[in-house]
Amino acid sequence: MMHSFKTRLAVGVLAASLALCAQAADVTGAGASFIYPVMSKWSADYNAATKKQVNYQSIGSGGGIAQIKAASVDFGSSDAPLKPEELAAAGLAQFPSVIGGVVPVVNVPGIAAGTLKLDGKTLGDIFLGKVSTWNDPAIAALNPGVKLPEGKITVVHRSDGSGTSFNFTNYLSKVNPDWKGKVGEGTAVQWPTGIGGKGNEGVAAYVKQIKGGIGYVELSYALQNKMAYTAMKNAAGKFVQPSDETFAAAANSADWGTAKDFYLVMTNAAGDNAWPITATNFILVQKKPKNPAGLKNTLEFFRWVYTKGDAQAKQLDYVPLPDTLVTQIEAYWAKNLPH
């Protein structure tokens, strides 16, 4: 009972703070830290072009879902798509905003970005605590000729409800049977080992601080923080580097036309050049909002994103949505939202 009260109190306090932000903004949003770098750039450029202000709070996908369900913001953002039945129950609509990638990041002396190779099974075993030193035979077998230290591995995971975690654990569940059986997938799971950081920002900070650390973040966080990310073996058996090109290769396998309410997860995608932990960010809005002007302004903002925001996304190593998908989104708006 006390835990439930504390949860309701925390949501209420956050809602109140977001409401204060709303008074000064034309559009308010909250959710995934995954897209915060590009959302910040979009918002600044949109303001410069239109004089309209978009206030986006990076609170994690779980927080974004809670806030849009509570109608505390004009839109929520999540890297974990909601299933059609959950959307219907909450009176929500959902559509994609941009595509990016989740990358393992490490702090291992002598290991530069892109030099360490991992596969899904070994990555899962590290996060299970089964592989606990950097010179473990499983890691050494994937990295012949690389001098690996004897040091202990410290796992860093998310402490908050996270779409980044959803895509990471969804991938591990597809490629590591032990992970699927013992942990599974979700925005929040019972982590077998490690320490928790809040947001992509928190995970990046901990990994940078902890010698021997490993975590997972969206690529732009790794690049901005000059962190060493790993290469990954994909579903085709090829080792690939994270980039907008390998994210786009994974996205090419997505069949959005058959995805009701755009419910689609593209981890472990086919293709020789596909990054295996590629993810989509989704925007959630109320179908019958208390503030119709907020929804109208939200759709105007994302219409601008789809037509004028590609360069900003590419600059930060995200992948803009293809024109065919944008056309589907506009048709979805016309069918499901007031206009």
What spans do the regions from the language model cover?
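Flexible loop/hinge segments at secondary-structure junctions
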Residues: 24-339
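Bacterial N-terminal signal peptides
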Residues: 10-19
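Bacterial N-terminal signal peptides that target proteins for export
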Residues: 1-11
